């Protein structure tokens, strides 16, 4: 059944279905303008870099945390123990930003340095621990329907299958598995990683994804604020198309003009 309501994650409602990352921008100004143009409400921050990002500035001080909901992530963690420790630190940083009730964490456990693929076993282990500690866990995973269902069953707030490897810009490479995850999930499905252009963001939403998380496609564009706006439009268009319902594909043509009662 199609959900026409707002995006609901961990008991909190969001109007925007586009989450945006804060890494890789050439300047703080580019980042701030991009966040604004994207109309996002949720922004991810790497806990290990929040006090010294690529621009050398403190994100806690540069971002208006009354406007954006912080999604701390455990980027850089290679096992479950590290991820749990960084998640706890991230929750404290959210409190320092004024978000006392924020228990969100984007769970990333990535020992693979070349392709940055997430470790399914360590992700599951960390998720179980963090859920018991009261976190709303948003796990970054491969497009694995069985793992996605298992994470849902233990209480994760969303599942976040990758479209393709982080920062690769290859788009959605495993449409079949992503479709199975979307069809089977009873929690929001957020496509994370690999989206490079607005059409790919739209494609994810047309499939029925509940949202997308994008960083590199915006931050590394020639004009990040403009790309943020374009991707925002793509997400909205894809969502509307999904709700509207596309025509069925068929192997033959059907005339769009009536064939009967034609006056000459």
UniProtKB/Swiss-Prot annotation:
Main localization, broad class: cytoplasm
Localization (cell): Cytoplasm
Record EC number: 2.8.1.10
GO aspect biological process, one term: thiamine diphosphate biosynthetic process
Record family assignment: Belongs to the ThiG family.
Role of this protein: Catalyzes the rearrangement of 1-deoxy-D-xylulose 5-phosphate (DXP) to produce the thiazole phosphate moiety of thiamine. Sulfur is provided by the thiocarboxylate moiety of the carrier protein ThiS. In vitro, sulfur can be provided by H(2)S.
Subunit structure: Homotetramer. Forms heterodimers with either ThiH or ThiS.
HAMAP family associated with the record: ThiG (MF_00443)
Protein name: Thiazole synthase
Organism phylogeny: Bacteria, Bacillati, Cyanobacteriota, Cyanophyceae, Synechococcales
């Amino acid at each position: 059944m199609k959900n026409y309501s707002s995006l609901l994650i961990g008991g909190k409602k969001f109007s925007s279905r586009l989450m945006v990352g804060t890494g890789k921008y050439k300047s703080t100004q580019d980042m701030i303008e991009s966040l604004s143009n994207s109309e996002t409400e949720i922004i991810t921050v790497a806990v290990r870099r929040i006090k010294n990002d690529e621009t050398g500035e403190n994100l806690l001080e540069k971002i208006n945390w009354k406007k954006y909901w912080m999604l701390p992530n455990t980027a850089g963690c290679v096992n479950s123990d590290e991820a749990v420790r960084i998640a706890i630190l991230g929750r404290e940083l959210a409190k320092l930003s004024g978000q006392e009730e924020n228990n969100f964490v984007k769970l990333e456990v990535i020992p693979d340095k070349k392709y940055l693929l997430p470790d399914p076993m360590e992700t599951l282990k960390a998720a179980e621990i963090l859920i018991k500690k009261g976190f709303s866990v948003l796990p970054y995973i491969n497009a694995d329907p069985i793992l996605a269902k298992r994470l849902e069953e233990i209480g994760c707030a969303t599942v976040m299958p990758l479209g393709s490897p982080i920062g690769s810009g290859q788009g959605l490479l495993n449409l079949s598995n992503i479709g199975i995850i979307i069809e089977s999930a009873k929690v929001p499905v957020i496509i994370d990683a690999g989206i490079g252009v607005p059409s790919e963001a739209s494609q994810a939403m047309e499939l029925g994804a509940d949202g997308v998380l994008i960083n590199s496609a915006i931050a590394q564009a020639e004009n990040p604020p403009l790309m943020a706006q374009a991707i925002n439009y793509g997400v909205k268009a894809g969502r509307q198309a999904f709700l509207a319902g596309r025509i069925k594909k068929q192997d033959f043509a059907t005339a769009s003009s009536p064939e009967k009662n034609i006056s000459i």
